């Protein structure tokens, strides 16, 4: 394996949508960071069989709806 070409691999904490926390090794963030999941196997419709809900991350969905609200579609 070549030296100094791979990202740092360290421990992070992952928090699922139901509040469950676990630690895993990852290249995301830095040592000790917390990754809060928006969607996980406990809440994703593909695994739960439930209704699909739209997650408006960053206001993109709201911006789209506002832009095209006058079309009446």
From Swiss-Prot:
Signal peptide boundaries: none
PROSITE patterns per UniProt: RIBOSOMAL_L31 (PS01143)
Pfam families: Ribosomal_L31
GO biological process, alphabetically ordered: translation
Keyword RNA-binding assigned: yes
Keywords: Ribonucleoprotein, Ribosomal protein, RNA-binding, rRNA-binding
Record has Ribonucleoprotein as a keyword: yes
Cellular-component GO terms for this entry: ribonucleoprotein complex; ribosome
GO molecular function: rRNA binding; structural constituent of ribosome
Family designation: Belongs to the bacterial ribosomal protein bL31 family. Type A subfamily.
Stated role: Binds the 23S rRNA.
Subunit and interaction comment: Part of the 50S ribosomal subunit.
Name assigned to this protein: Large ribosomal subunit protein bL31
């Amino acid at each position: 394996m070549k030296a100094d070409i791979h990202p740092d691999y360290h421990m992070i904490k992952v928090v699922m949508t139901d509040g469950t926390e676990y630690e895993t090794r990852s290249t995301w963030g830095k040592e000790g960071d917390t990754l809060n999941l928006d969607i996980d196997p406990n809440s994703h419709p593909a695994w739960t069989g439930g209704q699909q809900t739209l997650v408006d991350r960053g206001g993109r969905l709201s911006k789209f709806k506002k832009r095209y609200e006058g079309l009446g579609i």
